[in-house]
């Protein structure tokens, strides 16, 4: 049965080599099979033609290559954003989003993939569709990789590739740091898809222990903080994990992060009407982030069914933006919406699928 076989996509090149040797295959096949799995992204042992038929049969008998079932697919008519709803082996579902944009010269298409790290999310941010849908479990290494590989295979058919990865999909990446770290080592392997860790961004709600592990393991990724308020009392209300990792602790670990990495930190700030867009909120935000080399990304709230929050008017959004930029001299951007004509907010497509909506 499949569940008695080894999921071969979960293994690093070193682990794969050890497995193949234990199965009686030659040691150098470790690199060859790794290339088939992670660079060529094959989904069949039969395609591994530089292995003998006998060795391929051994792999079929003892291991398997997992793949996703695509439940739903949406593409934006406005900006060509693509959204995928995948079904996992145990019936769980996750979302992955492909963001397509022109480069600075407005010529070549750049492809950024927004990747999920968990089935649901335990953080339960009040503004997030994923948080409303509950939490099931962490994604395995292969489930993280398969999001990337499934989309990369589609792009290759059009002569394109993935350029950047952002772990801003479903789940809190730093609560799945072990599997995420292992997946990153495979992704950045020169014998694999070989996406540099410097082109990978991890977005976190502020899991201080996870940021500490990034520093300890010297994982050279870009970091984005889902801040959304620089006032503890307010942040507690919308991001419950702030009670465990308050702003003072977050600030301390980010100071150390920037000291060690010399990298700019992105702060994401969802604009919620009548909650976090006053001048007091703007000043608190500016005071908090001015100690860092930073960019603040303002995100107008994408309304979620069942959530109590609402989106501010364009006038209020612009007032907040201009005050930060011109008065407080914050390095701030206003996010250009992607996929606004499809289920754009994280978790919305999954939520609709659960309800049986089309």
UniProtKB/Swiss-Prot annotation:
Reaction(s) catalysed by this chain, per the record, are: adenosine(2503) in 23S rRNA + 2 reduced [2Fe-2S]-[ferredoxin] + 2 S-adenosyl-L-methionine = 2-methyladenosine(2503) in 23S rRNA + 5'-deoxyadenosine + L-methionine + 2 oxidized [2Fe-2S]-[ferredoxin] + S-adenosyl-L-homocysteine; adenosine(37) in tRNA + 2 reduced [2Fe-2S]-[ferredoxin] + 2 S-adenosyl-L-methionine = 2-methyladenosine(37) in tRNA + 5'-deoxyadenosine + L-methionine + 2 oxidized [2Fe-2S]-[ferredoxin] + S-adenosyl-L-homocysteine
Name of a matching Pfam family: Radical_SAM
Give the signal peptide range: none
Give all residue intervals belonging to the Radical SAM core domain. Answer: 107-335
> Record-annotated residues binding S-adenosyl-L-methionine?
171-172, 203, 226-228, 302
Q: Does the keyword Cell division apply?
A: no
Tell me, in one coarse class, where this protein mainly resides.
cytoplasm
Note the Gene3D superfamilies from the entry: 1.10.150.530, Aldolase class I
Sequence positions that bind [4Fe-4S] cluster: 121, 125, 128
Q: What class of enzyme is it?
A: transferase
What does the record list as GO biological process? Answer: rRNA base methylation; tRNA methylation
User: InterPro entries, per this entry?
Assistant: Aldolase_TIM, Methyltransferase_A, RlmN_N, RNA_MTrfase_RlmN, rRNA_lsu_MTrfase_RlmN/Cfr, rSAM
Q: What GO CC annotations are associated with the protein?
A: cytoplasm
Q: What is its EC number?
A: 2.1.1.192
The active site of this protein is located at 95 (proton acceptor), 346 (s-methylcysteine intermediate)
Compartments in which it is found: Cytoplasm
| Gene Ontology molecular function | 4 iron, 4 sulfur cluster binding; metal ion binding; rRNA (adenine(2503)-C2-)-methyltransferase activity; rRNA binding; tRNA (adenine(37)-C2)-methyltransferase activity; tRNA binding
Cofactor, how bound (note): Binds 1 [4Fe-4S] cluster. The cluster is coordinated with 3 cysteines and an exchangeable S-adenosyl-L-methionine.
Q: What cofactor is needed?
A: [4Fe-4S] cluster
Query: In this UniProt entry, which cysteines form S-S bonds?
Result: 114-346
Keywords tagged on the record: 4Fe-4S, Cytoplasm, Disulfide bond, Iron, Iron-sulfur, Metal-binding, Methyltransferase, rRNA processing, S-adenosyl-L-methionine, Transferase, tRNA processing
State the similarity comment.
Belongs to the radical SAM superfamily. RlmN family.
Under the heading NCBIfam families, the entry gives: rRNA_mod_RlmN
Q: What is its biological role? A: Specifically methylates position 2 of adenine 2503 in 23S rRNA and position 2 of adenine 37 in tRNAs.
Q: What else is known?
A: Reaction proceeds by a ping-pong mechanism involving intermediate methylation of a conserved cysteine residue.
Name this protein carries in UniProt: Probable dual-specificity RNA methyltransferase RlmN
Q: Which organism is it from?
A: Fusobacterium nucleatum subsp. nucleatum (strain ATCC 25586 / DSM 15643 / BCRC 10681 / CIP 101130 / JCM 8532 / KCTC 2640 / LMG 13131 / VPI 4355)
The beginning of the lineage is: Bacteria, Fusobacteriati, Fusobacteriota, Fusobacteriia, Fusobacteriales
